[in-house]
Amino acid sequence: MVQPYKHEPFTDFTVDANRQAFLAALEKVEAELGREYPLIIGGERVMTEDKITSVNPANKAEVIGRVAKANKELAERAMKTADEAFRTWSRTSPEARADILFRAAAIVRRRKHEFSAWLVKEAGKPWREADADTAEAIDFMEYYGRQMLKLKDGIPVESRPGETNRFFYIPLGVGVVISPWNFPFAIMAGTTVAALVTGNTVLLKPASATPVVAYKFAEVLEEAGLPAGVLNYIPGSGAEVGDYLVEHPRTRFISFTGSRDVGIRIYERAAKVQPGQIWLKRVIAEMGGKDAIVVDKEADLELAAQSIVASAFGFSGQKCSACSRAIIVEDVYDQVLNRVVELTKQLNVGDPAEQATFMGPVIDQGAYNKIMEYIEIGKQEGRLMTGGEGDDSKGFFIQPTVFADVDPNARIMQEEIFGPVVAFAKARDFDHALEIANNTQYGLTGAVISRNRANLEKARHEFHVGNLYFNRGCTGAIVGYQPFGGFNMSGTDSKAGGPDYLILHMQAKTVSEMF
């Protein structure tokens, strides 16, 4: 009997035993740094001369691992393997597939701190952020396993006398999962197991900045009983391997999480029907945001300030849900702005391996350079209140940065920065604040801080985002509780961790029998 779903609790690091366990996990991971990792194709380990070098963003001299790098030939081999494995895996019972997810979740739960320690080292996540990432990975496995069991017999439809009608779901085929570096365990695992539990086979191309944790997860799935060839681990260049697989005539669907520009490129390339292709490919995409917290004059101003700071600067603002715009009605603008600046100045920036660190590095040199360029733009477009400095001598550290008095159409109010930068804009009233909030090509998350029920109800209908929060920050969606995905250029509104997500990986079949 499968127990009802509940999300994995976060670790309380005020408990000394938990602290000691996490420190021990960090020591274990540090002892394994610098190893080489192969591709996994059909269960076989394939080493390549060309490697992807994963480094610690807090200490770029520290190599996390050197990972084999797939090319087109190896990608083709993986595709043939996955295509062949689909014949048997697609006929494996939903119960058996779900059981593999439950076993994998149990394995990760037993090694929870170890996986979180890999996230500290490879992604630069502070303890709490790493712990939440691992918990979310467990949640995806537990939730999607249960969702597949709910869907396994289809959905009831009507039948007339002398007729029996059945409506049920079957797998699609080979899926290409292109996962991001910012949630390198949770989103990588979630998108992978959603495709697997629905009976598809997977080619997993993890982000080049964080391939080691993906390899560790592939090992977990093997240990949990996933047959060889059902998941093939093939990190590689997006321009070479990514494009090749997106365009491949045997690819049935692509599950992508990443930037708007790459998402658009994938969508365009997947739309073209290749010679020999006998279906229209499906694209499941989550492509970022320009998320806003709106504060009205009747808000709890301390809650507003704390929500903005936590949402803007958690994991250095490297979340597609991060608050990069704070839209405050003019009556309370100065109070909220000044309190946010006070709180921001208190934040601890440093090595994520230290428990006291609130904010670690950004992911790599490219991200560092881009964010620092946006900070220079911000100095022209707004008033720098705090932050603005960076140091990439050892790692990629940027101070949390607040700009005030920014025009709603300014670049730092319109373009996704993906770093620890928040821009403040002043609104005349609540209606104007919503107008500013919706003035973006994205529509992922948003929050409203208000005690005014009429304003909250107005926002419920008019604030055009996929995930809207009242009287809390705009990050931290929980699997099964707040299904996650956005509108417009934030993607295909595929609600990860929601009741209709698995259906995106299947196709419906109707069978009607007369008797």
UniProtKB/Swiss-Prot annotation:
Signal peptide: none annotated. Gene3D superfamilies: Aldehyde Dehydrogenase, Chain A, domain 1, Aldehyde Dehydrogenase, Chain A, domain 2. GO terms for molecular function: 1-pyrroline-5-carboxylate dehydrogenase activity. CDD domains: ALDH_PutA-P5CDH-RocA (cd07124). Coiled coil: none annotated. Its EC number is 1.2.1.88. It catalyses: L-glutamate 5-semialdehyde + NAD(+) + H2O = L-glutamate + NADH + 2 H(+). The active site is at 286, 320. GO terms for biological process: glutamate biosynthetic process; proline catabolic process to glutamate. Keywords: NAD, Oxidoreductase. PROSITE patterns: ALDEHYDE_DEHYDR_CYS, ALDEHYDE_DEHYDR_GLU. GO terms for cellular component: cytoplasmic side of plasma membrane. Pathway: Amino-acid degradation; L-proline degradation into L-glutamate; L-glutamate from L-proline: step 2/2. It is an enzyme of class 1 (oxidoreductase). It comes from the Bacteria. InterPro entries: Ald_DH/histidinol_DH, Ald_DH_C, Ald_DH_CS_CYS, Ald_DH_CS_GLU, Ald_DH_N, Aldehyde_DH_dom, Proline_metab_enzyme, RocA. HAMAP family: RocA. Belongs to the aldehyde dehydrogenase family. RocA subfamily. This is 1-pyrroline-5-carboxylate dehydrogenase. It comes from Geobacillus thermodenitrificans (strain NG80-2). The gene is rocA.
